[in-house]
Amino acid sequence: MAERANLVFHNKEIDGTGMKRLISRLIDHFGMGYTSHILDQLKTLGFHQATTTSISLGIEDLLTIPSKGWLVQDAEQQSFLLEKHYYYGAIHAVEKLRQSVEIWYATSEYLKQEMNSNFRITDPSNPVYLMSFSGARGNASQVHQLVGMRGLMADPQGQMIDLPIQSNLREGLSLTEYIISCYGARKGVVDTAVRTADAGYLTRRLVEVVQHIIVRRRDCGTIRGISVSPQNGMTEKLFVQTLIGRVLADDIYIGSRCIAARNQDIGIGLVNRFITAFRAQPFLAQPIYIRTPFTCRSTSWICQLCYGRSPTHSDLVELGEAVGIIAGQSIGEPGTQLTLRTFHTGGVFTGGTADLVRSPSNGKIQFTENLVHPTRTRHGQPAFLCYIDLHVTIQSQDILYSVNIPSKSLILVQNDQYVKSEQVIAEIRAGTPTLHFKERVQKHIYSESDGEMHWSTDVYHAPEYQYGNLRRLPKTSHLWILSVSRCRSSIASFSLHKDQDQMNTYGKKDREIFDYSTLVRIMPNGHWNLIYPSIFKENSDLLAKKRRNRFVIPLQYHQEQEKELISCLGISIEIPFMGVLHRNTIFAYFDDPRYRKDKKGSGIVKFRYRTLEEEYRTREEDSEDEYETLEEEYRTREDEYEYETLEDEYGSPENEYGNPENEYRTLEKDSEDEYGSPESKYGTLEEDSEDDYGSPGESSEDKYGTLEEDLEEESEDEYESPEEDSIFKKEGLIEHRGTKEFSLKYQKEVDRFFFILQELHILPRSSSLKVLDNSIIGVDTQLTKNTRSRLGGLVRVKRKKSHTELKIFSGDIHFPEEADKVLGGCLIPPERQKKDSKESKKSKNWVYVQRKKIIKSKEKYFVSIRPAVAYEMDEGRNLATLFPQDLLQEEDNLQLRLVNFISHENSKLTQRIYHTNSQFVRTCLVVNWEQEKKEKAGASLVEVRANDLIRDFLRIELIKCTISYTRKRYDRTSAGPIPHNRLDHTNLNSFYSKAKIESLSQHQEAIGTLLNRNKEYQSLMILSASNCSQIGLFKNPKHPNTIKELNRRIPIREIFGPLGVIVPSISNFSSSYYLLTHNKILLKKYLFLDNLKQTFQVLQGLKYSLIDENKRISNFDSNIMLDPFLLNCHFVHHDSWEETSAIIHLGQLICENVCLFKSHIKKSGQIFIINMDSFVIRAAKPYLATTGATVNGHYGEILYKGDRLVTFIYEKSRSSDITQGLPKVEQIFEARSIDSLSPNLERRIEDWNERIPRILGIPWGFLIGAELTIAQSRISLVNKIQKVYRSQGVQIHNRHIEIIIRQVTSKVRVSEDGMSNVFSPGELIGLLRAERAGRALDESIYYRAILLGITRASLNTQSFISEASFQETARVLAKAALRGRIDWLKGLKENVVLGGIIPVGTGFQKFVHRSPQDKNLYFEIQKQNLFASEMRDFLFLHTELVSSDSDITNNFYETLEPPFTPIYTS
């Protein structure tokens, strides 16, 4: 009884770790047998209690946490603030994602802690609580998802979804939450399935490598060891784990007293003595050397002492134990059980999450300010850092609370601040951050609204995308999207589009656009003028397209004023990009309505051209040769080319009309083989001008569509890709490179051309045809279910791989009596119809005769007789009939010529689109001048205002040289910053460059075309630079005082330089090289709505200024419509202006909430109008972008909602859950290179191999080099693998991993340097075998260390039977047979395969005879020590040589004491 009274009575709950401790103490105290008896009683007790308690589980037992409501509210408020900061442009997208994930993760974790205390206080016998927290079933995180909140989920890529699931499973999820939840859950299910297979295969490979490793001897006699010391940043726990169960490699002294001898195994008692010794004298304690499998000298087995204690009991491992297989299974097995942390997968946390300290109640907080230092949190918010533990008091109404805050925490509140209950007052940094594998991730940011892009810093052009639109930001700055309202209409009297912009006015299908013709133009005298109501007629689809290097401006003509002219000419003027015209450039064209195709549809155009010298043949010469020549001229080239459209005839019209941009999909090809260059003969403009593209005028007034055509080889191969030609496709529109110039040399004249109707349908393979091949049909016959023929005639069907072609040839067929006499492919005029033909009726039209062959009977020919429409070319059209003649006075040196072009190539099929007309002939105006004059002309648009009328002129003038307004362009190839990505200062808007003004006055002669805005003037007129007076932004001799007066009236403006002028009533002539202005902020000179007149006085007339990118001020018409509601007026009072030192200037970008003039700016934006008492801000959205981010797009480019703006590259920590963890372990074992092995191990080994022999400079160099290399890589590999497992909380003893790593690194490759008689170069041999062979032969063998993966190691063992049973059986056996290999059956697997006794087990010793090697042990040790001392002297002399790789040389001295001392780190 007395004994029992002295026993300690423990009265507390016991959990898993407590149970572990109890069992290990029982084993130490009583041994294995008795312990198992005690544990049996425990088990019985447990089952008895569980049965009597009879725990049941109901949904009522899931208690929700009361504090959840305000916690979630708190987190939502933080998220809202975050969103707001993002909106202001204070943080960037990646930062927002990180913080939001952190906020919700912290909330979720705090809820989890609350849950534990909640259960403990309210219902300690709750079955859910009992089950999960006793470790019986379930864990805290599962219960947390049931009663707390589900928290953050990861998507399948492992990226965090920043919308948290706030509900728990007890409350039920909303639809969105359910979908997000499925993401994470599905990932979990897939991972579980995948990891089982992965882990199983990993185990198999590991066991394969080490199955032959057995404990065969007591001691191998090594004197080497690995040093372990707690000073090297190793935690105490890790230190204990590493030491227990090992054997000492050297005696250990404290002072002069030896406390442990060599070859003694280390138990818990010894470890505790070490730790106390280290604590007492941390600096004097020497590292402890232990034996490991690495240091064992045996090749294919291991000795007792190098292995240490058995994992099962506290004694040395027994001889005959198969430790290799145990090791393989110990590593592979946890892989199947590693916990899956689904909700942590986002891995956005770089450290552990911080613990938050919350205020216990409302009250005033106080702490000693001297103990804290101001700093910032990792999110940039101000905070205080306390270096020592801080005592904080909170004074509520009647109670004084005190809170202790540990050192190195951040205080998030001010002293004497009033805090609310549960407010976060401090943040405790988590301990050592867990291991995270970093990876670089790209995040794309997309624009949230339409707008124009600006940035507030210089950018680099990324050199690899020299001509692309990607830029790199050299420093953190804002990108701005300036608001633009969605309407892209052609309200402007003529449209000048920026590069690549598309303008639509919507056709009848688009009803959502209201009628813009109600918008009126503000005229100075106040009368209203409707702009182009004609655009809004039904069924007008207009698409103006700015091509790569020219502008298109339609000239509108009004019918009632043009009786003597051709009605409804749509003249389109094209101005090249830089405004420079070369000789013989076409700068305007229009379409003559007489050469328009009628609505009959598609067909073939035929003509013959004659050179200018050729004499015109009259039609009366009806000789037989005439027919011969005709036949040759007009022979169809059917074998070479036919036509087919990309138009899907069977598509629904909805698709076509839905989006006007898709309607015109034309693919042309210049058949260069036939015609040389596109400009060679008769200069077809078809390739270049894309017909109706880009001539808005003709489309809106003359309703006809484009020609669609495509070449198709008749031969079986598919049509060629358009890449071969110089046409390229962009955004559904075709552009063509090259300028439209042609030379007179090749020009042919055409006297007449013919149009022969023909129809082509491209049908899908699947469609069933209602007509037969070679049959004759009438008009409007049904061809397929929803296609009808437009022509009557002969049907030809041809089936291709992807589609079916159906051609209809108009006309009748005729069977001649004698097949030979029929001529194929000739045209017959109306007078000479064949009398003997069976056609009795006489035709007034020309007839085209085509010879066909019926496929079925080879002899029978027939002739297809097809009507042809003849068009005569009109030679008489000239400038006089085009324009009123009296206004045109041609100068000597600039001429305009009129040229007609046929828009189609000879014998080509042209396809009709829907119910539209198409044009055959296009008339062009060509500008030309004498050869010896200057080589270039400049074109510009001029606006002249006089007497309330606005007139626009196209001015063409000769230019001396381009230097006057283009400086040297920036060199695009250099990667230096381009200032604001601008082209260059002077060439953007040369109206403001002095040089250009001089060049204007030098050339008085110029042709100007009037682009009429007012019905009174439609004409071409001459305008010379001297006729106009410029009043504007530079001092003019005629009005020297203009600007000064204005500046006197508005004193503020002097700060900002000239901000535009209010125009005197006489005239304002401003010639702006529109073509050169690349980026400008633009404003409509329209009054938007009547009732806004008062508010937006500022928008009226010309009382405002606009700026372009280069801070130049200008007044322009534009295509960007600014919505008045996007503009905010800020009134600036003089007094407030003087008080605040804020200086604003045009174009300044201001973030929301910036304090200017005593009031906050309510919206972010750009100042772009400054008045006397106010300024106008154009709404804009800032996006913060960090250094190195890539910007997509150009400065001033218009982006639409959803376009990609910026790409961030940021590092995120890879989550170390199983999906990333197991593969990492596997990669290391397989010796594949992975990013997070900081320097690649393979490379590190190479370096060592090269360096060490050079440093040591002795014949043993290779041996030492290889050994040091192998030692170094082994240590680093073990650490890497342990990190992955420890991060998952899995404990694996180091020696299991060491046994496997030893096999992976035990081979060296014989190098070619020294040819040895024993091994062939490139052969893999064991390191020890190489050493022994070297000693035996007395010559050095050259080899280098290599790292084999576990698979390769399994295929490089000494037993070919083991290899063959693993992989590649046939290959391994064949090789072994050819080489005559012998298998000594040393391992387990070989014996199992052959059915022998396996050489393991405790009876093993009887088979083993003592080897004579043991007797020589002492002598060897002596020799080793001799070598060690020599090495030490050598290294002492050359310390600085070795210090290049610090990792190892720190310990180099000890390395050779007991030779190996690399260090384990946690």
Curated annotation (Swiss-Prot):
SUPFAM superfamilies in alphabetical order: beta and beta-prime subunits of DNA dependent RNA-polymerase
Top EC group: transferase
Reaction catalyzed: RNA(n) + a ribonucleoside 5'-triphosphate = RNA(n+1) + diphosphate
Subcellular location as annotated: Plastid, Chloroplast
EC numbers on record: 2.7.7.6
Keywords: Chloroplast, DNA-directed RNA polymerase, Metal-binding, Nucleotidyltransferase, Plastid, Transcription, Transferase, Zinc
Region described as Disordered: 615-725
Gene Ontology biological process terms, A to Z: DNA-templated transcription
Chain residues that bind Zn(2+): C220, C296, C303, C306
Pfam family, one: RNA_pol_Rpb1_5
Required co-factors: Zn(2+)
Compositionally biased region (Acidic residues): 621-631, 639-651, 707-725
Molecular function terms, GO-annotated: DNA binding; DNA-directed RNA polymerase activity; zinc ion binding
GO cellular component: chloroplast; DNA-directed RNA polymerase complex; mitochondrion
Domain of life: Eukaryota
InterPro entries to which the protein is assigned, alphabetical: DNA-dir_RpoC2_beta_pp, RNA_pol_beta''_euk, RNA_pol_Rpb1_3_sf, RNA_pol_Rpb1_4, RNA_pol_Rpb1_5, Rpb1_funnel_sf
Major localization class: plastid
Family that this chain belongs to: Belongs to the RNA polymerase beta' chain family. RpoC2 subfamily.
HAMAP family registered for this protein in UniProt: RNApol_bact_RpoC2
Complex formation: In plastids the minimal PEP RNA polymerase catalytic core is composed of four subunits: alpha, beta, beta', and beta''. When a (nuclear-encoded) sigma factor is associated with the core the holoenzyme is formed, which can initiate transcription.
General function of this protein: DNA-dependent RNA polymerase catalyzes the transcription of DNA into RNA using the four ribonucleoside triphosphates as substrates.
Protein known as: DNA-directed RNA polymerase subunit beta''
